[in-house]
Amino acid sequence: MKALLVLGFLLLSASVQAKIYERCQFARTLKRNGMSGYYGVSLADWVCLAQHESNYNTQARNYNPGDQSTDYGIFQINSRYWCNDGKTPRAKNACGIPCSALLQDDITQAIQCAKRVVRDPQGIRAWVAWQRHCKNRDLSGYIRNCGV
Amino acid sequence: MVWLVAMTSRQRSLCGLAAHGLWFLGLVLLMDATARPANHSFSRERAANRDENEIIPPDHLNGVKLEMDGHLNKDFHQEVFLGKDMDGFDEDSEPRRSRRKLMVIFSKVDVNTDRRISAKEMQHWIMEKTAEHFQEAVKENKLHFRAVDPDGDGHVSWDEYKVKFLASKGHNEREIADAIKNHEELKVDEETQEVLGNLRDRWYQADNPPADLLLTEDEFLSFLHPEHSRGMLKFMVKEIVRDLDQDGDKQLSLPEFISLPVGTVENQQGQDIDDNWVKDRKKEFEELIDSNHDGIVTMEELENYMDPMNEYNALNEAKQMIAIADENQNHHLEPEEILKYSEFFTGSKLMDYARNVHEEF
């Protein structure tokens, strides 16, 4: 039994390596950082978007062979336009940050960058997953019972 | 992308300006400002989560090891283990319920009820789940086909599809239909033009004789889901090889398969990301795709690797899945091993593992 308990603790410690937010935890963090209604985008929109982009995994990374860019973090923000990873051709870095900043457990910088993205004319439509899963849907379930 | 709509409406308001220079400057600034998607998640959308009226062939196909864009399908293990029940193991759901569900699956896989899973049993299960994904695709295809065949004559032409595709990209459906009817050049951006070209190639490939560019419902299914059509699977393989093949010899070397973009990585974390990506692809290349281990992947090898109904692949996959969780190395899976490695099988940790097992004893 002791061995199993030790195993359990090891599992717990292993899970700390990659910060994966719980849905409501994420919603509260967003609200605390002024995301509710930012540029007309509701909290539920942001939660829905992040679930479909990264399943709330702060260290999600996906490479895009097409333009040799990479999408980083809980919002899957792209290195071609928004951040610098030192290896993306024709990069712009509109958020003025290294892409590694988007992978941190503390998602403050990722939120600031997401705000910058949504201030562009296309707004939240910059996120394909939002268009395909969240647009014109009833999103109340994404923040249900979160107290936000 | 929808940003074209914004440009169109903005262009109208700019037409009133007298100075052409200002109009051009505005256009250039607008193009630069609006053509910046947050990411390219399009290529990674799960097929199971597609909208009902989805008419664009997905890059991601459930139960297929490589995406259409050459990425490894990181959800493959869960897809062939869970079948269409992939959404039942959300992080939010209670651990006890997830555990019970996992044990129900275990008892189904364990055909001879000896309380452990053999490679043969897992292989059989994988084949069953893969077929399940295909049945799901057939069902979805009826809806998609109905969306592109509104007159219900059982055929959809390339021109009809093009109208629907561009409408789904935010273009005005009537304007597009008129332009096509009058053989006018379509005003679409470069990226959409390229996608259309690829789609047209696939359309040609899916169009069985007679070559009339009209697709039936079955042909449309192979257009959206090439993995279960021999001809379309070959086409898919050819596309992937073409994308990755740098020296043009129509096969893939290890460097080609794992190639990363040139450039200096800025820090150690970036280097770690690259290393992980390369390591995963190298392992897949050497251990699985290159079946004769000669350092070269031919189109035939890649096709065998991607064929979801290949029995040899399913057995290999079964052995691989068992090996990952088989702690006592008896080449079988016991209930406690599956529970401990639940994240590998379901994509979701069972955080109360220790407590649950304690209660079981």
Swiss-Prot record, chain A:
Query: Which pairs are disulfide-linked?
Result: 24-146, 48-134, 83-99, 95-113
PROSITE patterns referenced in this protein's UniProt entry, alphabetically: GLYCOSYL_HYDROL_F22_1, GLYCOSYL_HYDROL_F22_2
Active-site residues (renumbered): 53, 71
Instruction: List this protein's GO terms for biological process.
Output: defense response to bacterium; defense response to Gram-negative bacterium; defense response to Gram-positive bacterium; killing of cells of another organism
* Enzyme class of the recorded protein, top EC level: hydrolase
| Gene Ontology MF terms in the entry | hydrolase activity, acting on glycosyl bonds; identical protein binding; lysozyme activity
Write out the similarity annotation: Belongs to the glycosyl hydrolase 22 family.
SUBUNIT field? Monomer.
This protein's name:
Lysozyme C-1
Q: Which organism is it from?
A: Rattus norvegicus
The organism's lineage is: Eukaryota, Metazoa, Chordata, Craniata, Vertebrata
Swiss-Prot record, chain B:
Q: Where is this region: Necessary for intracellular retention in Golgi apparatus lumen?
A: 308-361
Drop me one GO molecular function for this one: identical protein binding
Q: What induces it?
A: Down-regulated by ethanol. Down-regulated during the progression of cerebellum differentiation.
Q: What is this protein called?
A: 45 kDa calcium-binding protein
At the top level, the lineage of the source is: Eukaryota
Q: What is the lineage of its organism?
A: Eukaryota, Metazoa, Chordata, Craniata, Vertebrata
Q: Which SMART domains match?
A: EFh (SM00054)
Query: Any idea which positions bind Ca(2+) 3?
Result: 212, 219
Outline what the protein does: A membrane-associated isoform may be involved in the exocytosis of zymogens by pancreatic acini. May regulate calcium-dependent activities in the endoplasmic reticulum lumen or post-ER compartment.
Q: Which organism's genome codes for this protein?
A: Rattus norvegicus
Query: What does the domain comment read?
Result: Binds calcium via its EF-hands.
